[in-house]
Amino acid sequence: MPTPLLYRKPQEGRDYWILDGALKDPEGVLAQAQAREDWIYGFPHKPEPWPGMRALDALTAEELEPIEAFVQKATGSKRLWQGTTPEGATLNHNCFQLVGKDESGPRPHTDSLKLCRYAAVVYLNPKPPEGTGT
């Protein structure tokens, strides 16, 4: 069993980073998400650890490039990659994920420590309610 991480208060610039305006055309990306019909359902619809529904291959390589460049610069990482366990398990990445208000509560985004070192979330909410943080 892996050693659990000790809790330390998250600090911007060490444990997390914020990139405003990450997408050149967020409205276009939102329209792409809304047009998708190939959704995979998670909790509570299916026995998955993740809530809501997902569609794979969300952003194009051109849309991902500036985000990945920011991550590499901010973290000092020379490369970004998708890991696989010896058993063949992997993470989904570059997904649209829609989560309804009754499908989950507020919580941080986390991924398996066996498979990933960095995780990112791009919020696409065209008219977020006041004080929602998106």
Where are these regions (language model features)?
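Fe(II)/2-oxoglutarate oxygenase catalytic core
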Residues: M1-T134
